[in-house]
Amino acid sequence: MATVIPSPLSLGEDFYREAIEHCRSYNARLCAERSLRLPFLDSQTGVAQNNCYIWMEKTHRGPGLAPGQIYTYPARCWRKKRRLNILEDPRLRPCEYKIDCEAPLKKEGGLPEGPVLEALLCAETGEKKVELKEEETIMDCQKQQLLEFPHDLEVEDLEEDIPRRKNRARGKAYGIGGLRKRQDTASLEDRDKPYVCDICGKRYKNRPGLSYHYTHTHLAEEEGEEHTERHALPFHRKNNHKQFYKELAWVPEAQRKHTAKKAPDGTVIPNGYCDFCLGGSKKTGCPEDLISCADCGRSGHPSCLQFTVNMTAAVRTYRWQCIECKSCSLCGTSENDDQLLFCDDCDRGYHMYCLSPPMAEPPEGSWSCHLCLRHLKEKASAYITLT
């Protein structure tokens, strides 16, 4: 069934006029908004749409100028671009003469006299002051942005030339983003690795890592240089190491054999606690006999050292050495520790090139030395692995 639309006249004349007024004001606001809009890119046609100025009002109509033309509308208002102010005084023109500073100014020269000359000089000094102020404000803004500006720019903007005075050298400014990123990475590295080597500047996450770095890098270099080139080693460098060790209250591994507590008969006094669990025996929870190093005196539980039953019984039959004091049982040296091969039954160390026949690569699985093979025979770890 069709809907019956009531006539506007039946609603009243006041209501009709109010509706027309609302419609007119809405159209006026819409047209004003469209005229003030910036051009936008149409995604379908790729054209930058802008106000077309084709909508005119009755007040814009004019009489026709050509035959058969009823109305004419005014063209779009042309706006002149702003340009530099042209000097009105014809005498205020650029100077075309070379000025000799030593010679006195001639009245017949190209420079004008009186108030015009004063105006030229004042304008020239004023322009220089304005340029200097602009340069100072630019530099201040750039410094402030480098310190406080929050957002990051591309890394490609790291180096940009800054305009300076004509007689000064050109400098380079660092982009805000690159400097900020480098500061962030540096602060993150400082936070993650707070322990710094005072000689080479290398960073570590914990103090044991820094101590290991000192011992195996700088201390070894110093000991080698003391024997070969004693005069080439700076004195303050050795003092830095000694001061660091005193503050740390830590003895390097290379000096532990000399500073270990010794009995009157010359034997090393072992520690009375486990260096791994500090006496708690966390792995088994039961009391265990400590195994002590014959060189440095450090001790450990067999369970903390991950020793097998055969290994625990074998280490008590000879002068056992911890992993840091370990040396080759054949040649007696601790050099080339990367070539040391450890027995899985007695924990003795052997250089692979000291064995007979020598080995080029470590064997796969368990390995037993010739002493354990002779003593344990079929109970050796090497036989168990093969079977």
From Swiss-Prot:
CDD domains: PHD1_DPF1, PHD2_d4. Gene3D superfamilies: Classic Zinc Finger (3.30.160.60), Zinc/RING finger domain, C3HC4 (zinc finger) (3.30.40.10). Keywords: Cytoplasm, Isopeptide bond, Metal-binding, Neurogenesis, Nucleus, Repeat, Transcription, Transcription regulation, Ubl conjugation, Zinc, Zinc-finger. Zn(2+) 1 binds at C274, C277, H301, C304. Its main location: cytoplasm. PROSITE patterns: ZF_PHD_1, ZF_PHD_2, ZINC_FINGER_C2H2_1, ZINC_FINGER_C2H2_2. The keyword Metal-binding applies. GO terms for cellular component: chromatin; cytoplasm; nBAF complex; nucleoplasm. GO terms for molecular function: zinc ion binding. Signal peptide: none annotated. There is a cross-link at K106, K129, K133 (Glycyl lysine isopeptide (Lys-Gly) (interchain with G-Cter in SUMO2)). GO terms for biological process: chromatin remodeling; nervous system development; positive regulation of cell differentiation; positive regulation of double-strand break repair; regulation of G0 to G1 transition; regulation of G1/S transition of mitotic cell cycle; regulation of mitotic metaphase/anaphase transition; regulation of nucleotide-excision repair. This is Zinc finger protein neuro-d4. It comes from Mus musculus.
